[in-house]
Amino acid sequence: MKAIFIILAILMVTQAFKMTSKVNTKLQSQIQSKFQSKNKLASTFQTSSKLKGECDTIIPDFTGCNANDACPLSFTCSATGNDEQLCNAAGQNVIDMIFAHWSTCWNTYGNCIEFARQTYAIYNAPELCGCDYVDEETWINTLESVCPYV
């Protein structure tokens, strides 16, 4: 009788490890698929080194990121003159920021989306980037697909 309980206990532990392994594998594949979308999105906004070198650095006001020097928004800048190449670079920089600072600046899908919403104002405001090549709805939809959903 005691042997049966030991065998059952071993089977239960083995099954628990298998289930944990399946969950971890599924979670890992979800994360990988979200991060692989960066390659697809890179074609949405052309990369330009011009904007990255010319822009000021500010610190975003996000939960866990207040006064955190590891979280710059390097795409803020004086007006681009609505230059298409500079505006595309601003969009690419947002995508780069999401991936470069995942877990440092935002660690939930919700605050990543909040970042995406705030960045449109920077992209579009005449006194900042001054770009209007992408409307706000398209901007949010594009960046929502970049935010890792974990």
Swiss-Prot record:
UniProt key word Signal: yes
An annotated Gene Ontology molecular function: pheromone activity
Entries under InterPro entries matching the protein: Mating_pheromone_EUPOC (IPR008612)
Assigned keywords, A-Z: Pheromone, Secreted, Signal
Subcellular location: Secreted
GO cellular component: extracellular region
Main location: secreted
Function noted in UniProt: Mating ciliate pheromones (or gamones) are diffusible extracellular communication signals that distinguish different intraspecific classes of cells commonly referred to as 'mating types'. They prepare the latter for conjugation by changing their cell surface properties.
Protein name: Mating pheromone 1
Source organism (scientific name): Euplotoides octocarinatus
